[in-house]
Amino acid sequence: MTAAAGQLRRGLLMGGIMAASLAVTGTTLTNAAWTDNEYVHAHNVGTDGRCEQDSGTTTTASARQLSGTLLNSNLDSVAALHGLSVTNDGAGTSTASANAIRINPDTFMAPLDASALNTDLLQLSLPLGLPVGSADVYSQWGQTLNNGNTTAASGLITDSGGALGLGQTQNPDNPPVMATLNLGAVIPTALAGITLDVGAASSIAELTYCGDLGNGWQGPLPDPLVERSYQASALNLNADMPTLDAAAAGADTLLRDVNSKLQAAQPGLSAAVAQDLIAASTPLLGGLDSLTPADVETEVKLDLSQLDLTAAKVLLTSTMTDAQGLITVDFGSGVARINLAKAEGGINSLNGKAPNTKIALDQDITNQLSTALTQVLDTWRAKVITAVQQAIRATPASVTATVTVRSLGIPVGEIGLGLGPVTTGQLLDLHYGVPGTPVAPVTTSLKLLVLSPPITALDTLASGLAAALPFISGKALHNGLILGVVETLNTSLQEQTSPVGPALAKALEQVNALLSITVNVQPDQPGYPGTTKSTPLSVTALQISLDPITALDLSIATSSIAYTD
């Protein structure tokens, strides 16, 4: 192998996980990797020839996408999950396990076909068992070259025209889900309604037996070089929460009551307008000898149409995510989805971890999630309230008033006032003093009840009350609807959502006590959760188990290499 080819191979093996793009249905596959003729058939200046010879070393590449135990059953008993094993005898011959598909004399692939594995505990959701060369194949891949160089890869990979691609999906914000683990099926008392979505995961292990000697020449290395990498695209914890269901159901009931509360408020609104009309008449009575507000009677009717609350009701089945993307709440299904990858510190925070790193829901993360949930619930409640306010503002309002003026107890005239229909929002904005709000027109009529009425004074009173009526009506609507109906609704929604936070905190506490998640699992390195093993040299992208029981112990995307001189 040439120096250039060897460097290309190592660089792409280690960088392919981060750079190669492979996605599920609806996206485009990009094979950014190396090709067979580049790492098998290169003959350039810079090699002493020994890298083109049989190594005399037996090497094995093994790749397995799923292994472990489910419901106390070892997955070794499932033939479709046996993975791939390729061995080179060091004398020029590579052989592979029975399920392997040969790509070239030294390279094999075994697409995963686990359709029969779906259980109450584990549901696989990626397209599996597709032909070699198809996009989106979850597969196992191995290569053992005659010179001893060996590679194993497991994950969302494909081989098309000899080009291998594996690793991160094209849309890291919404990666594909490989499998869903129903944790509640194992421990229903503690983890009811809890599921774990595992995103596309890949791993790669490489043995460089023959490579750069450091002097510009390629040859057998004094000590074989082992490199291991992994990629995990997503890890989402889903909590089906009765408190969320109850909050959405309670909000629905509250919204159904809004129109009835609106109708019930109308007599009070009319009374408020009447009271303020009498108060507004005080400075206008100067032309009517010895009259006081007690001599002015009003009869007011304020009519509001039924509210269209469609926009508010849509929010009851909406999905919302906090600003950091830590938690997504589906109010329609009552499920809170926690992005454990981002909770660990960023979009790729499951990756680049030291060997045998545990992913834990510690107190800091729990506090982050609590803050994120509060943000989502507050945003949702604010959106519901805003939608109700907008519905109120859009509804038409009409006001009719009759003002009877008496002198010495004798009615001398009746002033009729008519406003609308105009939108409630226009009247509210007049009350709020919003610049540019057009004044709603008011019609007036005057009925004289005596032979010599004070016409000029009555006209002045009518004009003054007509000018004041839109502002008086806006004030009544604000006090009765915004401060009354809407604020009461807001308080009730707060009461509906208040149990959600403590319920999630309790669920996370249970999960943290029982669920163990480890990334970049390497049995020969410190911190390995099992018995330390020095051979084979392997890497597993994700290991998931439930402690202290053994009903679930799942390893995802394992690649390993072994060699004997």
Placement of each model-derived feature along the sequence:
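Short, polar/proline-rich extracytoplasmic segments that appear immediately after membrane translocation
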Residues: 6-59
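N-terminal secretory signal peptides that target proteins for export/translocation
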Residues: 1-5
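Extended, solvent-exposed, non-transmembrane regions
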Residues: 51-565
